[in-house]
Structure formats: structure tokens, C-alpha cells
Design a protein with these regions (language model features):
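Histidine/acidic-rich helix-loop-helix segments that form or flank divalent-metal centers
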Residues: 68-153, 199, 203, 208-209, ...
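Long, well-ordered mid-to-C-terminal structural blocks that present hydrophobic/aromatic surfaces
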Residues: 190-230, 235-242
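His-Asp-centered metal-binding catalytic motifs of divalent-metal-dependent phosphohydrolases/nucleases
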Residues: 18-41, 101, 206-224, 312
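Alpha-helical phosphate/pyrophosphate-handling elements in metalloenzyme active cores
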Residues: 1-24, 171-207, 291-293
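Active-site flanking loop/helix segments enriched in acidic
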Residues: 45, 159-181
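Metal-dependent nucleotide-binding catalytic modules
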Residues: 133-144, 169-171, 175-176, 240-244, ...
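Divalent-cation-assisted or electrostatically stabilized phosphate/pyrophosphate-binding catalytic cores
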Residues: 46-68, 95, 176-178, 228-254, ...
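Aromatic- and histidine-enriched alpha-helix N-cap/loop-to-helix transition segments
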Residues: 1-2, 29, 95-100, 177-184, ...
Length: 362
């Protein structure tokens, strides 16, 4: 989804404001993630062959598997998920997602290719990936990334989070990457935004998703500094945050076009504060009630930072509980899970009963 964001921004710059349906892009990414969680561990060539010949049956299987999990979500969202696969159309957003998928595949494949170019059939795999990317070469973002310069540098740095482990000092199963965590927070924030009891404007949905997707981006430069360390010395948390902001401005933002910097800062700075934009200024600390009553309009760019924070903690709680349930646990892991649970037990935040959600996963 990071690559899809970059491609979509370039495409929007080329074709004009409104040319990219960002909600369709975000939901398409979530739909494809859900689809592949059911049809996991299938090699891409096999997967595409299966979808071509038995797509209807496979999609029906996916819908049945996810029916219980999606129960309670917005009914229109559930229908859009089904329509995405049953009424397949070659929209710009789908092409962007496909291009992003193949570029991500190429990025991972290069690591293997340079390590073991002698593997049987590896050159054919390389050719297949390159052919798929060529089919999307008309997208200006694809061309920019393939230049291997600044845009590729940004994606390459983000890609490193694919190999950066969460809770690296504590043995856990399953292990989770920082990049995977970022997507889970983004997708969950988006789903929660639809369930807040008010119809969120499209910019609010957009901001809550991408703030989740980029909220841990500075960790590519500072690594995963765990909360106990941040809180062990008074003022250390502020020092780390200042350093992250400095590194963002010096290392990451220069890799992106200047017009994008404002959005990227909006996503990654003070990310756990409710905020809006008014008269070209960012206003922090806006209450959930005020966002709903006064600022739930695209012109104010509302962002629910408090929601993002609790979803981030929920993701950490689930990561810990999954490992404990698998029998891989430690005193530190159990204590972390219990502390997070007690922090949100019985609380309702941004219109959502998170106490009930935490209790479900306990």
C-alpha cells in the first residue's frame, strides 16, 4: 500500500485532482489483503492460474470463510468486498494496486536473485515479473520508481520495515514486522472510522488510513524503541521524538516531491492527536465531538489521532496475546498484554466500545 500511495500520488499530479478515487484504492487494498489471508501460501503464478480458471468458486470460498469475521461490519462495505471480485472492472485504482503488487514482488525478488542467481528457473521468474511491470509502464509512478532514484529510495527505505521485527527483544510466535503492523493499524483504523456512529467524510477516512499506514515510518531510521525504554528516563521520549522528526526532514522527505511533504508530516507528526486543518494551520487536540459536529468535512482534513492510538495499542495487544495463546510467552510479554488490557478495559473511544473489543481478544 505504500507503493500504491506513491503511484497514485504521481498519477493524481499528472491527471489532476479527483482523478484517483482514494477510497476505492484503500478499500481495494483491504479487500485484496482479506482475499489473500484465506488463499495464503499460494505461489503467484499458481494463484493467477487458479483465479483465471476457477475464480468464481475461489471467491465464493473466500466469502464463506470470512462471513463470520465480517459479521457486524458495515453492510455496504461487505457488499463492496463481494462486488470487487464478482463485478471485476479494470479501473485505474485496480491497475495501481496491481502495479504496486508487482513492484513489491520485484523488490523482494531482487534480494533472492542477487543472493542465489543460480537457482533453477529463476531467470524465467525474473522475466515474468518484468513483463507484468511493463504492462503497467504507462503509469507515471511506475516509471519514476523504475528509475531507481528518489522515489525508489523512499520505497526501498519503507521496504526495510518488512524485515524489521516488532518486539525484537522478546521471543514470539508468530513474529510480526513493523511494515505489517503499520498496515494492520491502517486497515483497522479505516474500519473503525466507518463504525463511529457518524458518516465520516472521505478525507477523514483517507487521513485515518494513511496516518495508520505511516505512523511508524520514522522507525526505519531509529529502529523499534520499545515503550518501557522510552518511559524509563524522564524526557527521553521527547528526545527520541525530536530526533525522529529531524531524521524525517533530513532523510525521508527529500525523497518525495515537495508538495507531498505537508501530507506526510500530517500523517506522521503528532499522529496520536485529534486534529484538523483550518486557515492553513494544523489545530491539535480537537475533541471527537467537535470533529463530528463542526469539522467532519473534507475542507478541514479531520484526523482521529485518539482512534489511531488505541488501534495501535490494540494491534500490540493482539500480537502479544497470539504469542501467549501459541504457548510462547514470558513474564514481560504477559505483563505487557495485561497492562494494555487494563488501560482500555471498559473504555469507549471515538464512539467505539474498545473495552468490549479488548475483552474479546483477551
Amino acid at each position: 500500500m505504500v507503493i500504491a500511495y506513491v503511484i497514485a500520488r504521481f498519477e493524481e499530479e499528472r491527471m489532476g485532482q479527483g482523478s484517483v478515487d482514494w477510497i476505492a484504492l484503500i478499500e481495494g487494498g483491504i479487500f485484496e489483503f482479506l482475499h489473500r489471508t484465506v488463499l495464503t501460501d499460494i505461489k503467484p503464478p499458481v494463484f493467477h492460474r487458479m483465479m483465471k480458471e476457477k475464480g468464481y468458486e475461489l471467491n465464493k470460498h473466500v466469502f464463506e470463510k470470512l462471513e463470520m469475521d465480517m459479521d457486524g461490519l458495515d453492510k455496504n462495505f461487505q457488499q463492496r468486498f463481494k462486488d470487487y471480485y464478482l463485478k471485476s472492472t479494470n479501473t485505474l485504482e485496480r491497475r495501481i494496486l496491481r502495479a504496486a503488487h508487482y513492484l513489491a514482488t520485484q523488490w523482494e525478488f531482487k534480494i533472492i536473485y542477487h543472493t542465489a542467481p543460480f537457482i533453477y528457473g529463476i531467470d524465467k521468474t525474473k522475466e515474468n515479473i518484468e513483463n507484468q511491470i511493463e504492462d503497467h509502464y504507462d503509469l507515471i509512478g511506475v516509471q519514476k520508481i523504475l528509475l531507481g532514484k528518489k522515489s525508489f529510495g523512499f520505497i526501498d527505505l519503507c521496504g526495510q520495515l518488512r524485515f524489521q521485527k516488532r518486539w525484537a527483544h522478546i521471543p514470539r510466535i508468530p513474529e510480526t514486522s513493523v511494515l505489517g503492523h503499520m498496515f494492520i493499524v491502517a486497515a483497522t483504523s479505516y474500519l473503525c472510522t466507518m463504525e463511529m456512529g457518524i458518516e465520516a467524510c472521505s478525507k477523514r477516512l483517507y487521513n485515518n488510513f494513511y496516518a495508520g499506514l505511516f505512523h511508524d515510518l520514522p522507525e526505519v531510521l531509529t529502529k523499534d524503541i520499545i515503550s518501557p525504554v522510552k518511559g524509563s528516563v524522564e524526557g527521553l521520549k521527547d528526545i527520541i521524538k525530536d530526533y525522529e522528526d529531524f531524521q524525517m526532514n533530513e532523510e525521508l522527505l527529500p525523497l518525495l516531491p515537495r508538495p507531498w511533504h505537508e501530507d506526510m508530516k500530517y500523517f506522521s507528526e503528532s499522529e496520536f492527536n485529534n486534529k484538523i486543518k483550518k486557515n492553513q494551520k494544523v489545530l491539535l487536540g480537537i475533541s471527537f465531538h467537535d470533529i463530528n459536529e463542526k469539522y467532519n468535512k473534507n475542507e478541514y482534513h479531520p484526523l482521529d489521532g485518539e482512534l489511531l492510538h488505541v488501534v495501535d495499542r490494540l494491534a500490540a495487544f493482539i500480537e502479544a496475546k497470539l504469542s501467549i495463546d501459541h504457548g510462547i510467552k514470558s513474564e514481560e510479554l504477559e505483563k505487557a498484554a495485561e497492562n494494555i488490557f487494563q488501560e482500555y478495559n471498559g473504555l469507549k473511544i471515538s464512539g467505539i466500545d474498545f473495552g468490549r473489543i479488548f475483552n474479546y481478544f483477551r
